[in-house]
Amino acid sequence: MALKPLHDRVLVRRTESEEKTAGGLIIPDSAKEKPSEGVVVACGEGARKDSGELIAMAVKEGDNILFGKWSGTEVTVDGEELLMMKESDIMGVIV
């Protein structure tokens, strides 16, 4: 199943978090937090003004992004857990 976001929504794949600390300690799965970084998998066309004019998206497929801890809604596409969120939930693009 393919999923294309509508309007100003973005489909994001979380990046894997580190399994070791800087000191070399291994972090068990039960203690890991979900990462707040990800890669944009798909984008909608953008939001529309009241006049109908299209507001272009600031992110594109393949961008590495930073988002809020509680942002988005988890969706499963082809057995893979992804996040669907509004573009406004994205805090920035990692360059």
Curated annotation (Swiss-Prot):
Main location: cytoplasm
Any one cellular-component term (Gene Ontology): cytoplasm
UniProt cross-references to SMART domains, sorted A to Z: Cpn10
Entry's Gene Ontology molecular function annotations: ATP binding; metal ion binding; protein folding chaperone; protein-folding chaperone binding; unfolded protein binding
Alphabetical keyword list: Chaperone, Cytoplasm
PROSITE patterns: CHAPERONINS_CPN10
Localization per record: Cytoplasm
Top-level taxon of the source organism: Bacteria
Gene Ontology biological-process annotations: chaperone cofactor-dependent protein refolding
Keyword field contains Cytoplasm: yes
Function recorded in the entry: Together with the chaperonin GroEL, plays an essential role in assisting protein folding. The GroEL-GroES system forms a nano-cage that allows encapsulation of the non-native substrate proteins and provides a physical environment optimized to promote and accelerate protein folding. GroES binds to the apical surface of the GroEL ring, thereby capping the opening of the GroEL channel.
Family as reported in the entry's similarity comment: Belongs to the GroES chaperonin family.
Subunit structure: Heptamer of 7 subunits arranged in a ring. Interacts with the chaperonin GroEL.
Protein name: Co-chaperonin GroES
Gene: groES
